[in-house]
């Protein structure tokens, strides 16, 4: 994948299914870079927003209740069907994080539109705090 550092490992849902550190409803992909940065990726190209937000709630609950093997929880990434779905998700996520009192960077959540991965841009990812700006997965 051109947006990842060389030497990064990408694991599918089937590969991570045997590990206990992941949420019960496993993400579709798990990414680990050579320098130890991590991300879990959820593909939701055909789901309504309320289902996507429920999935996010499950991951946030897992991050708070069970945590991760090391101190920092992986980046939480959602790939959505188009830009409209991405912006709706990011807006709803911003409101959720704000109501929870989470600080910027405390639980990194990013979203991308599926079609963005085919475009010649630096990165397809955006954050709830700056939905119109693109940011690298691992800054």
Segments (PLM) and residue ranges:
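Electrostatic, structured charged patches in enzyme active sites and in nucleic-acid/phosphate-binding
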Residues: 1-139
């Amino acid at each position: 994948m051109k947006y990842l550092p060389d030497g990064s490992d990408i694991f599918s849902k089937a590969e991570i299914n045997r590990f206990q550190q992941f949420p019960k409803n496993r993400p579709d992909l798990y990414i680990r870079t050579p320098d130890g940065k991590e991300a879990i990726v959820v593909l939701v190209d055909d789901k309504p927003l309320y289902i996507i937000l429920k999935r996010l709630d499950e991951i946030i609950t897992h991050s708070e209740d069970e945590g991760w093997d090391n101190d920092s929880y992986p980046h939480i990434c959602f790939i959505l069907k188009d830009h409209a779905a991405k912006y709706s998700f990011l807006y709803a996520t911003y409101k959720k994080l704000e109501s929870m009192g989470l600080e910027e960077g405390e639980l990194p959540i990013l979203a991308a539109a599926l079609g963005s991965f085919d475009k010649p841009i630096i990165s397809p990812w955006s954050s709830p705090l700056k939905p119109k700006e693109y940011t690298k997965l691992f800054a």
